[in-house]
């Protein structure tokens, strides 16, 4: 159980933060003259890295809606090296069809790496590599640790690529090496990952259903609700719908 994430996904390397993991993976894949297709709905620091950081070093990034497969296909170029997505996405729980995105990207160029941030789902609910993704990144600060006392991240994928991340992206480019005590705490947390995720999912579903009927709530974003635009895809590629949700209040910011 302690190593279920790595066993399922072949190999992984630990980092000192989620952004350390993401940055290490992307710097291993991309460089000057390369192109990345990324979803426009991302964790804020990931968006900043792609939109402001990598462009300083000659990496072109095109932001698209990865739930729109035609948009993904149209954005691919000869120099595209990666397609980056989160599913479920932060903060609106948007769902992308991992298998379909991977089929499009690899059909265009087998060398393109499909990178999936699996933080909101965790390995207990979703295995992107089994769906066709090449690389999976996690912020272990959240579900994988589960106790709120660690900042950490993981990059997961084929052993040869993870070796490159370890020696170049992590060691040389970011230096975001996990400390031993953080590793110990995460191993502790992984023991209860599956049972914690069961409770997270049950709680989120109950809250989402309550908010969905609340007179002051305009819209609830939770893939477990049948009217969520990504419900059917989430039901197909996830074991359950996750523990995260967001919502809008009627009247917008002024009402909140």
Q: Predicted regions span which residues?
A:
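Conserved C-terminal alpha-helix-loop-beta "cap" of PLP-dependent enzymes
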Residues: 217-256
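Conserved PLP-enzyme active-site core in the AAT-like
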Residues: 12-216, 221, 227, 232
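Short, small-residue-biased leader/transition segments that mark boundaries at the very start
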Residues: 2-7
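General structural signal for secondary-structure boundaries
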Residues: 1, 124, 178-179, 251-253
């Amino acid at each position: 159980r302690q190593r279920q994430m790595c066993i399922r996904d072949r190999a992984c390397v630990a980092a000192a933060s989620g952004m350390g993991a993401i940055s290490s993976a992307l710097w291993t894949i991309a460089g000057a003259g390369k192109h990345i297709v990324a979803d426009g709905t991302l964790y804020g620091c990931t968006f900043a890295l792609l939109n402001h950081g990598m462009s300083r070093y000659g990496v072109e990034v095109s932001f698209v809606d990865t739930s729109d497969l035609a948009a993904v296909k149209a954005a691919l170029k000869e120099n595209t090296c990666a397609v980056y997505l989160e599913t479920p996405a932060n903060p609106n729980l948007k769902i992308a069809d991992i298998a379909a995105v991977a089929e499009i990207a690899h059909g265009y160029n087998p060398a393109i790496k499909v990178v999936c941030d699996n933080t909101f789902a965790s390995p207990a609910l979703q295995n992107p590599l089994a769906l066709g993704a090449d690389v999976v990144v996690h912020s272990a600060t959240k579900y994988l640790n589960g106790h709120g006392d660690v900042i950490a991240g993981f990059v997961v994928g084929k052993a040869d690529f993870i070796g490159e991340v370890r020696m170049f992206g992590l060691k040389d480019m970011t230096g975001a090496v996990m400390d031993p005590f953080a590793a110990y705490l995460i191993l502790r947390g992984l023991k209860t990952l599956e049972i914690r995720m069961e409770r997270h999912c049950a709680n989120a579903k109950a809250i989402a259903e309550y908010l969905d009927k609340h007179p002051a709530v305009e819209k609830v974003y939770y893939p477990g609700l049948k009217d969520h635009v990504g419900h059917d895809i989430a039901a197909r590629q996830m074991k359950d719908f996750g523990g995260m949700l967001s919502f809008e209040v009627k009247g917008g910011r002024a009402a909140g």
